[in-house]
A protein has these predicted regions:
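Extracellular carbohydrate-recognition regions
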Residues: 33-61, 221
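Ligand-recognition surfaces built from glycine- and aromatic
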Residues: 37-38, 202-229
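Short tryptophan-centered beta-strand motifs in secreted/extracellular beta-sheet-rich domains
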Residues: 43, 109-111, 172-187
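Secretory/extracellular carbohydrate-interaction modules
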Residues: 48, 84-149
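Extracellular glycan-recognition surfaces and repeat-rich motifs
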Residues: 50-83, 90-92
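Short, solvent-exposed beta-strand-to-loop segments that form ligand-recognition rims
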Residues: 188-209
Length: 229
């Protein structure tokens, strides 16, 4: 075989292009991956008993700081879950675990969550277009109230924009989804669309976070983020 022919050089060019593309993607980090499509948070690779890697922690409202950890859970898809363990009963207290290096306006976020315990609340949710700990949208499910609600949080104050009342069973995994496209927000629960909301308060790109309330001990699994055009 003649190694100097045009087919040979075409093959070499293709291989080099593939290697270069893979190298650029690997070196670009989480932001580049998020901009090109879907990421799934690798909870199964996180260290048990430690704070979940790739997240920054904050709080809306009053009360003590949250306690986020990686917990062993054989019912989780990878045997581990992200858990908020603090039982501070301050009612207007909303712990946030903000995913690092991701900013998007249009996206689809899905999680599995399990409400483990809580006297004041047993809630878990997703925050999007997060500017800071006091300004964002959030959808949350509550096992004590058997409902799902969508809020905007402006300067630390919540305002409900939509809701539905499905059964939210404690100590059982449920799926919660939020799709944000421009002014339209679509909320899904256990694979079914619940309701839609129109709002223009936060139009710019912002962060994505896991969210809980008050003394909720909540576990999170299968966090998937898909950026949209």
């Amino acid at each position: 075989m003649d190694g100097s022919g045009p087919k040979f050089f075409s093959l070499i060019d293709s291989v080099l292009s593939m290697v270069l593309a893979a190298s650029l993607l690997a070196s670009a980090g989480p932001r580049a991956l998020a901009e090109t499509g879907t990421i799934m948070i690798a909870i199964g690779q996180m260290k048990l008993g430690s704070a979940p890697t790739g997240f920054t922690f904050a709080r809306t409202g009053k009360g003590g700081e949250a306690e986020w950890t990686v917990a062993e859970d054989q019912t989780a898809s990878q045997g581990r879950a992200i858990e908020q363990t603090s039982t501070d009963r301050t009612d207007y207290r909303f712990p946030l675990a903000i995913h690092d290096s991701l900013s998007a306006a249009n996206l689809d976020v899905e999680i599995r969550f399990k409400a483990v315990a809580g006297k004041i609340d047993q809630a878990g949710g997703i925050a999007v277009r997060l500017r800071d700990a006091d300004n964002y949208y959030v959808v949350r499910a509550n096992a004590l109230e058997d409902n799902v609600r969508f809020y905007r949080v402006v300067q630390g104050r919540r305002e409900q924009l939509g809701g539905a009342n499905p059964k939210v069973t404690p100590n059982q995994w449920h799926k919660l989804g939020l799709r944000a496209e421009g002014e339209r927000f679509t909320v899904s629960y256990d694979g079914k669309m619940l309701f839609r909301v129109i709002d223009r308060t936060f139009a710019e790109a912002g962060g994505v976070a896991l969210w809980t309330k008050a003394d909720s001990v909540t576990r999170f699994d299968e966090m998937t983020i898909t950026t949209l055009p």
